[in-house]
Swiss-Prot record:
It is found in: Secreted. Belongs to the long (4 C-C) scorpion toxin superfamily. Sodium channel inhibitor family. Beta subfamily. Expressed by the venom gland. Has the structural arrangement of an alpha-helix connected to antiparallel beta-sheets by disulfide bonds (CS-alpha/beta). The keyword Secreted applies. Keywords: Antibiotic, Antimicrobial, Cytolysis, Disulfide bond, Hemolysis, Ion channel impairing toxin, Neurotoxin, Secreted, Toxin, Voltage-gated sodium channel impairing toxin. One of its GO terms (cellular component) is extracellular region. Shows antibacterial activity against both Gram-positive bacteria (B.subtilis, M.luteus, E.faecalis) and Gram-negative bacteria (P.aeruginosa, Y.enterocolitica, A.calcoaceticus). Modifies membrane sodium permeability on Y.enterocolitica. Is toxic to mice, but is not to crabs. Induces concentration dependent haemolysis in human erythrocytes. Acts by inhibiting the sodium (Nav) currents. This is Bactridin-2.
Protein backbone atom coordinates (compact mmCIF):
# COMPACT_ATOMS: atom_id res chain seq x y z
CA UNK A 1 0.00 0.00 0.00
CA UNK A 2 0.99 3.63 -0.41
CA UNK A 3 0.65 6.38 2.17
CA UNK A 4 2.13 8.64 4.81
CA UNK A 5 4.12 6.93 7.54
CA UNK A 6 2.86 7.60 11.07
CA UNK A 7 4.62 7.35 14.40
CA UNK A 8 3.33 5.94 17.68
CA UNK A 9 1.77 9.34 18.39
CA UNK A 10 -0.41 9.06 15.28
CA UNK A 11 1.38 11.93 13.54
CA UNK A 12 2.95 11.77 10.09
CA UNK A 13 6.73 11.41 9.98
CA UNK A 14 8.04 14.94 9.57
CA UNK A 15 10.85 15.47 7.09
CA UNK A 16 11.08 19.26 7.06
CA UNK A 17 14.57 19.41 8.61
CA UNK A 18 15.78 15.96 7.55
CA UNK A 19 18.35 14.98 4.89
CA UNK A 20 17.04 14.17 1.41
CA UNK A 21 17.38 10.40 1.90
CA UNK A 22 15.49 10.30 5.22
CA UNK A 23 12.08 9.29 3.85
CA UNK A 24 13.44 6.70 1.42
CA UNK A 25 15.38 5.14 4.30
CA UNK A 26 12.37 5.15 6.65
CA UNK A 27 10.16 3.63 3.95
CA UNK A 28 12.63 0.84 3.21
CA UNK A 29 12.90 0.17 6.97
CA UNK A 30 9.23 -0.92 6.91
CA UNK A 31 9.73 -2.88 3.66
CA UNK A 32 8.42 -0.16 1.35
CA UNK A 33 9.73 0.10 -2.19
CA UNK A 34 10.50 3.83 -2.13
CA UNK A 35 9.52 7.10 -0.51
CA UNK A 36 9.99 10.83 -0.61
CA UNK A 37 9.43 13.98 1.42
CA UNK A 38 6.08 15.33 0.19
CA UNK A 39 6.14 19.15 -0.03
CA UNK A 40 8.98 19.12 2.53
CA UNK A 41 6.50 18.21 5.24
CA UNK A 42 5.84 14.46 5.59
CA UNK A 43 7.20 11.11 4.39
CA UNK A 44 5.13 9.39 1.71
CA UNK A 45 5.93 5.75 0.91
CA UNK A 46 5.14 3.34 -1.92
CA UNK A 47 4.50 -0.41 -1.99
CA UNK A 48 4.52 -1.03 1.75
CA UNK A 49 3.12 -4.20 3.33
CA UNK A 50 -0.47 -3.93 4.56
CA UNK A 51 0.60 -4.18 8.23
CA UNK A 52 2.35 -0.79 8.12
CA UNK A 53 0.32 1.96 9.80
CA UNK A 54 -0.38 4.92 7.55
CA UNK A 55 -2.07 8.26 8.15
CA UNK A 56 -5.79 8.43 7.48
CA UNK A 57 -7.89 11.59 7.81
CA UNK A 58 -10.83 9.64 9.27
CA UNK A 59 -8.75 8.05 12.04
CA UNK A 60 -6.29 10.91 12.58
CA UNK A 61 -5.30 11.18 16.25
CA UNK A 62 -2.24 13.41 15.91
CA UNK A 63 -2.25 16.07 18.63
CA UNK A 64 -5.28 14.61 20.38
Amino acid sequence: KDGYLVGNDGCKYSCFTRPGTYCANECSRVKGKDGYCYAWMACYCYSMPNWVKTWNRATNRCGR
